[in-house]
């Protein structure tokens, strides 16, 4: 029994040591970033607010989606790390509200809209709550790329493989989605520098 436990511990240590390191952040990154509208490849609209009959018609709540929240959180996290985020109105006008579906389309949209420098493209691949009410976690899988819109080169890339994000105490999906989006963007953009 002891030999089997020791073998499992050794295999776990070796397995953890073989985890590939994340991409290093280039030291010469420009400090101004335009956050493009994130792509949603989940097949679900991922609504945070404006979903119920009451919200839509009585309260006239504007529709808010997970990609909207991710873009907002990305701007906030970038600013906390010393970057200047291009105002969302400027990006919205330049991109005409289009979300890119790939790195190439992100470059094309940025160039067409006259966005120079770096653009951040987020691709949401998986976003699934464990339950429709009282969700305790949301499984999130996405990638983020900082792309030089002039050269078309990806300067930095981060991937979050699908894994649960804890959302304890949240009663509805909208609040759980907000909580998960905040946590994921802080985690994903942390390599870009410490918060200031």
What residue ranges belong to the model's regions?
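Solvent-exposed, acidic/flexible segments
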Residues: 63-71, 99-103, 133-137, 170-181
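Surface-exposed short loop/turn segments
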Residues: 19-20, 98-151
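Acidic helix-start/capping segments at beta-turn-to-alpha-helix junctions
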Residues: 83-103
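A structural "domain/chain start" motif
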Residues: 17-84, 190-196
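Sec-dependent bacterial lipoprotein signal peptides
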Residues: 1-17
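Generic short beta-strand segments
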Residues: 38-41, 123-128, 161
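Short secondary-structure boundary motifs at beta->alpha junctions and helix caps
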Residues: 55-60, 141, 147-195
């Amino acid at each position: 029994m002891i030999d089997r436990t020791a073998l499992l511990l050794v295999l776990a240590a070796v397995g953890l040591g073989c985890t590939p390191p994340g991409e290093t952040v280039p030291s010469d990154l420009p400090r101004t970033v335009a956050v493009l509208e994130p792509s949603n490849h989940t097949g679900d609209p991922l609504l945070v607010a404006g979903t119920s009959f009451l919200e839509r018609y009585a309260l006239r709540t504007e529709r808010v989606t997970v990609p909207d929240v991710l873009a907002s959180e990305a701007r906030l996290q970038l600013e906390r790390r010393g970057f200047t985020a291009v105002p969302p109105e400027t990006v919205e006008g330049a991109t005409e509200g289009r979300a890119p579906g790939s790195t190439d389309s992100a470059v094309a949209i940025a160039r067409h809209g006259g966005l120079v420098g770096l653009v951040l493209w987020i691709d949401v691949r998986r976003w699934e709550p464990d339950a429709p009410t009282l969700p305790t976690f949301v499984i999130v899988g996405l990638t983020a790329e900082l792309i030089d819109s002039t050269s078309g080169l990806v300067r930095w890339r981060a991937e979050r493989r699908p894994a649960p994000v804890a959302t304890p105490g949240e009663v509805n999906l909208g609040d759980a989605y907000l909580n998960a989006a905040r946590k994921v963007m802080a985690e994903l953009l942390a390599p870009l520098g410490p918060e200031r």
